[in-house]
């Protein structure tokens, strides 16, 4: 389920960039994305005859999760305006590193030697992806770079809170309904504050937005919650390796995006860092037996 979640998340550029290219504001696209998703998942909750009632404490936790999801999704889609979507997605994919660091800071979960090496590799890969060692023509501006990295940090915080908060037990459908519904309200308020139009002008925009809501939102979030609740936050983040791969392939084949040699190497290094994180528990146990 974690792999399915990551692969479907990787389709966000394919379904959002064509709408953005027609002049629709980022906040408007995301508002409709989450509105349609909330209606779909909410209908499932009703069919399952599951109560939507939650305690005030759980509601506040859900609101916090929604705020994190608001920033994560908005900052990522904002990054698409300043760099290839595949690069933006790989930078966002720094979130497994943030998960490991947050688990260490908040819960004193040890970072072993292999995990530390993976974190350093990830940082090196991000440096290459940003164009730090290349000419100014190919380098990614510092502010957009920080923007997308912060989207990854917000997403990592979302994963950790989802796993370790005192949120009352609930199905992934109910949780997703709340997060998507509250995110819709946040984006509606954001559009109102920024003066963005709330209108989608044509059928093409509606089709892309509906698919954006269904595939990388409904399917991806339900499988993400399912994975986090059953296997934990760190393994779920690590299995997200398929997300940047999907985005890079989609960007190259469907959107005509090009990568520099350094960025390609950087992507490979980040993925190696993730694989090292995946293998670190097994390798650590084997090394202890030697």
Q: Predicted regions: what is each one?
A:
Residues 1-28, 32, 75, 137-164, ...:
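Glycine-/small-residue-enriched transmembrane alpha-helix faces in small-molecule transporters
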Residues 6, 32, 88-94, 161-184, ...:
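Helix-helix packing/entry segments at the starts of transmembrane helices
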Residues 8, 13, 45-92, 128, ...:
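Specific transmembrane alpha-helical segments of multi-pass solute transporters/efflux pumps
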Residues 28-39, 69, 76-110, 115, ...:
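Specific alpha-helical transmembrane segments that line the substrate/conduction pathway
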Residues 41, 63, 102, 111-133, ...:
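Hydrophobic transmembrane alpha-helices of multi-pass small-molecule transport proteins
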């Amino acid at each position: 389920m974690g792999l399915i979640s990551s692969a479907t998340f990787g389709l966000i550029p394919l379904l959002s960039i064509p709408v953005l290219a027609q002049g629709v504001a980022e906040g408007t696209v995301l508002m409709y994305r989450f509105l349609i998703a909330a209606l779909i998942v909410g209908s499932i909750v009703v069919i399952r005859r599951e109560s939507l009632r939650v305690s005030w404490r759980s509601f506040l936790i859900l609101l916090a999760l929604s705020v994190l999801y608001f920033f994560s999704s908005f900052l990522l889609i904002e990054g698409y305006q300043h760099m290839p979507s595949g690069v933006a997605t790989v930078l966002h994919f720094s979130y497994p590193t943030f998960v490991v660091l947050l688990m260490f800071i908040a819960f004193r979960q040890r970072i072993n030697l292999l995990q530390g090496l993976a974190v350093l590799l990830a940082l090196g890969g991000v440096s290459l992806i940003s164009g730090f060692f290349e000419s100014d023509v190919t380098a990614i501006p510092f502010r957009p770079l920080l923007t997308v990295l912060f989207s990854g940090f917000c997403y990592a915080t979302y994963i950790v809170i989802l796993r370790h908060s005192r949120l009352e037990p609930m199905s992934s459908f109910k949780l997703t309904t709340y997060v998507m519904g509250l995110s819709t309200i946040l984006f509606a308020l954001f559009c109102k504050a920024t003066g963005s139009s709330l209108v989608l002008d044509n059928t093409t925009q509606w089709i892309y937005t509906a698919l954006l809501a269904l595939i990388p939102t409904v399917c991806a979030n339900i499988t993400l919650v399912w994975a986090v609740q059953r296997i934990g936050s760190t393994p779920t983040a690590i299995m997200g390796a398929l997300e940047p791969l999907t985005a890079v392939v989609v960007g190259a084949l469907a959107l005509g995006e090009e990568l520099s040699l350094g960025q390609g190497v950087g992507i490979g290094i980040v993925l190696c860092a993730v694989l090292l994180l995946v293998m670190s528990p097994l390798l650590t146990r084997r090394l202890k037996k030697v």
